[in-house]
Amino acid sequence: GKWRLAAQFAVSFIIVTGLYLYVDIDGHLVVPLVPLKTAYPYLPKYLFIPLMTLIIVGGANAVNLTDGMDSLATVPLMTCAMFVGIVAYIGGDTDLATKLKIPSLSHDIKELAVLSALVISAGVAFLKYNSPPALIYMGDLGALALGSMVSAMFIFVKAELFLPIVGGIFVFSVLSSIIQRTFFRYILWSKGRKKAERYRFFLRSPYHHHLQRLWTYSEKGQDVVSVWVILLNKLGINPVPEENKLLTPQEVNSRVIWHMHIKSIWLFVLTMIIYFKVR
């Protein structure tokens, strides 16, 4: 609720302020696709601290929102941790950082690579029991804690602006929910409740629930019209594989989860290329 969100902002603001004042963190930002020699912008503390607070709170809640299906949030968290670990290890080596034209970080930042390895190892073990059908669950506490921790790790390695790329699965979960709610309110205001109940941008939100519903075959078809599906059809893209007619609901769930996991791996590869090669 609102009080929980307010508490998250308050605690995150205190933590970020402490990090800014007492740890080797400044207001410089590494901008994706822009070489350091071209732009290495500096934000004053009255802008930097609120932005970092927003990143931590946003990251925590994005992970929590994505954790709507068994194991769905686990692999994207692992790819985010892997990216931070690699950046921390290389950035903590002055010679390597200079050679690869990335920000040179404190030598102590290499310890963050150990924390990243722990997150990845825990994720692998967790997958054994969290894969569908799950025996244990991440829950709000786990998702919020891991999301805020991994988001803070990006701040330590000066890669805050890369979090939306490697963590694109989390970002799209949030965006799909915002788009869905905004579209519903617009149709409700302009066309009335009957139209708003019938026409949605996605069948459901967040996006993984849209895929879950879209890929579950029904002879009667969908009782909600999705603008997103209509747009894809007009572009000549069939969003529903034909073989889905033969899938059980459990198999559909597994396919959706694998679909999102594979995308998170591709986003990790893309982010690595952007960070280390596009300079």
Q: For the regions a protein language model found, what residue spans apply to each?
A:
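Alpha-helical transmembrane segments
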Residues: I15-L29, L33-V34, L47-M52, I56-T248, ...
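Membrane-interfacial loop-to-helix junctions in multi-pass inner-membrane proteins
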Residues: G1-A7
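Extended accessory regions or peripheral subdomains of proteins
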Residues: A10-V11
